[in-house]
């Protein structure tokens, strides 16, 4: 069995999850940060992180961390942590391709006594049913005899400077009791607030996938309530503030549900449920409702424009924000694109402005070229879609100055007071 003294870690995948983890471990023990994209490796070697999760100063502090896109550099590692994406495909089914590819790569350098820990969000059973067989097949080694595994789900919240990897409690697990204890010890090297050792890998997998599923369902409920209250002419935020005076009322808000976690992970759980003969109803209903919010937003906007006698066809709308959440450059699975596409269906021209987002990435992912400068008096409607600090600082007067003399200001994020906008969710 490995010892902490002999530990040499490889972190596979240096994105929003992998890099902060690699940096923290790199302050304590030897670490190789591995990514298949040489451009990412070059960027990190130059001391920069375009995701903005880790500062140049923090990168410098990780004195034992090196970066590589070459598998050969992983041969000396004995503790592998997999932090690759687990997306869904066009049919909203789990796409384990990145996980299988990562497992294949690790299998090529796996040795007797090594431990492989997965952090990527999956359905219960995926580690042992999909990943382990790949490791066995490629390496020729036998699971739980020659090598071992663990699962420790990531809980990174992109853009959150308060909840960082070191101060978020970590779930750990292992394929044997001894390995579970060792995995737990390894993570305790960097997790300052402690760990929770789950009773099995499947329990740890299930815990992760329901964290985001629970949040998704709760937001769906509030979204449905917002639709109901809008029909009744009641301000949803006023209702939620009043209800929030009760100590056990959960403080969710309506909105678009995007990103790489909340809008994706429930499909992993529903896929597994359906494979064992159970059709989940509440989870899928919540997904349908949340996925329909972009269209709902545009419908409400068009109605407001008509009431104000603003010509809809040929109108020009400014969408403030493209990233899936505030103060973050991440545009993966952003639902702002649903608003843009729906506006296009009405022959409305949509400009998107987001100072956080890389323009080349926006063009590559969505075919959108964000505007660089904001011009006053240009728009028939302004949609405040993401609550970036820059937009909050502008205030209602500056936001309205972007509109024509007759325009709609739609506040999706409750940034402004009710009286300062024409519409809000």
Predicted features along the sequence, with ranges:
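Structural/interface elements that position substrates and couple domains in central-metabolism enzymes
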Residues: 1-425
